[in-house]
């Protein structure tokens, strides 16, 4: 198990009155670094998150960019986006997210959006187990993985 985070900085949180509303995933981050800087990340914007991820060897991936009230972020400041968000109770408009990834040459990932037992399953299938956070980032950057379905989203595994 490797450290990661789902974050909505103050500028994109659902608790403000007006859009944009966005959630981002930070993948492959060292837990101590996240603990050190985590609160300050809530006060930054997407570009700041992206630069922080680059400086700390992590990836910034937008979660479900087309779900309900969400809108895609600036692709210039993303490493990737969820091309397949497999939450069983939301329509994440995965086909639009897949096109967004392809059009902007972003890494398309998959995730179960596992917040409770109903959501288990799905994600990505890597060619081998990563050794550490840096290796996880390298494997995802290589794009040599399959997005796997879940029991709620019956589909074959696929690659972007």
Feature-to-residue mapping (PLM):
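Charged catalytic cores and adjacent phosphate/nucleic-acid-binding surfaces used
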Residues: 10-33, 59, 66-160
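Binuclear metal-dependent hydrolase catalytic cores centered on His/Asp/Glu-rich metal-binding motifs
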Residues: 21-57
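A short, structured active-site edge motif that brings together acidic residues
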Residues: 2-11
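A residue-level signal for conserved active-site and pocket-lining positions in enzyme catalytic cores
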Residues: 1, 60
């Amino acid at each position: 198990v490797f450290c990661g985070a789902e974050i909505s900085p103050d500028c994109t949180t659902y608790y403000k009155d007006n859009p944009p509303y966005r959630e981002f995933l930070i993948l492959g981050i060292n837990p101590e670094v996240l603990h050190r800087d985590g609160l300050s990340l809530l006060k930054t914007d997407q570009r700041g998150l992206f630069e922080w991820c680059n400086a700390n060897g992590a990836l910034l991936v937008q979660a479900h960019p087309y779900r309900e009230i969400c809108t895609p972020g600036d692709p210039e400041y993303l490493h990737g986006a969820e091309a397949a968000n497999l939450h069983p109770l939301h329509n994440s408009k995965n086909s639009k997210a897949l096109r967004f990834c392809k059009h902007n040459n972003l890494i398309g990932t998959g995730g179960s959006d596992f917040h409770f037992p109903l959501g288990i399953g799905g994600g990505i299938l890597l060619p081998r187990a990563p050794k550490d956070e840096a290796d996880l980032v390298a494997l995802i950057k290589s794009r040599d993985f399959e997005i796997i379905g879940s029991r709620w989203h019956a589909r074959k595994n696929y690659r972007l």
